[in-house]
Amino acid sequence: MIKKICSVLSMVVFLGLLVIAGFLFVPKMLGYDEYAVLSGSMEPGIPVGAIVYDKNFAASEAREGAVVTYQLPAGTLVTHRIISVDKEEQTVVTQGDANNIADTAPVAWQQIVGVYAFHIPY
């Protein structure tokens, strides 16, 4: 009986570790980068603590409504929605879904590190 319980517990632990490994490694192998959401600026769609998975950014994806992750000059990463695109200047204006106003400075396409694909809530 004890052998049976140990066998079942071992299988449960193994499967749990397999699921965790899947969340950690499979997206990376498929070309996704992951970022933690530290503020409520994209709530309720993307909650605080969620892990956002992004694909590489291409200029053709600079369109209104797309959610992108970009790097501020100080190095901080921000995930916000594009609300306008200036193709001539190659910049976008972004805004968090929960914010009342747009972000203060336009974001150059070179600052964009990825386009939102999906997230896993905390």
Locate each region found by the language model.
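Protein maturation boundaries and topogenic segments
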Residues: 1-50, 56, 121-122
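Extracytoplasmic
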Residues: 30-32, 63-65, 77, 87-89, ...
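Short beta-strand-centered aromatic/proline hotspots
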Residues: 37, 66-67, 78-85
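Structural motif
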Residues: 49-51, 63-66
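Residue-level detector of beta-strand face positions
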Residues: 67-69, 93
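Extended, hydrophilic extramembrane loops/domains of integral membrane proteins
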Residues: 79, 83-122
